[in-house]
Amino acid sequence: MYEKTIEPVAIMYTGFGEKFGIPRQSGLVPEAAGQIVFEPKYQNPDALRGIEEFTHLWIIWGFSENRVEKFTPLVTPPRLGGREKRGVFATRSPFRPNGMGLSSVRIDKVEYKSSKGPIIHVSGVDMLDGTPIYDIKPYLAYSDSHPEASDGFAAEHRWDTVHVIWRDEALKSCMDEGTRITVEHILAQDPRAAYNKARDYIYGMRYGKFDIRFVADSHAGTIEIVDVVECIDGYHKVK
């Protein structure tokens, strides 16, 4: 049987320093930005020639924080509340053979004159900071878009967005408006696990250099940001 060893061609840098809060799919939070920085072996600008002709990219990447020791044929999709099982190949679960992810992102700009080689600035990401990227391909609307496609069980169990409220104290933080809007849209997706909807519990989410604390009311369909703490350690965004 043919086997092939692959290596990262680039690293994705994002504001998501931990798994909690990462959008469940790419494109759900259009403002979520990322920077694709190529490994030294692949920093030749010729490898990107013509990429600006496209608006979106397919990113093939690895779930680097998941350690799958053995093959598990059944998984519990979060969309089903963590109670029903589906075949791993019928889901987008990160706990899968080879641990590969596939995301569609928008190209914001391509930066060629950088000390780190070419950098592709993208948005709509759903990846952890430091995620290894194994391949990049242009998104082709004429062949990759299928409006008639069925969403399977996902169509019957859609995520409802929630209303995000800021307490006055949280609004006094030094968070800029762009980051504030991004955080609102991240929390509007309700990052809590379907089986963990405790009321009055204070949750914490790290985004960029900020630690955002919030409470949720599932009955009212709201998330209230109660505090924002700035912390500069562990933030790896490329300058």
Label each residue range with its predicted role:
Residues 15, 110-113, 125, 136, ...:
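Residue-level recognition of beta-strand microenvironments
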Residues 47-101, 195-199:
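Active-site-adjacent substructure of cysteine-protease-like catalytic cores
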Residues 198-218:
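Basic/aromatic recognition patch in beta-strand/loop cores that engages polyanionic ligands
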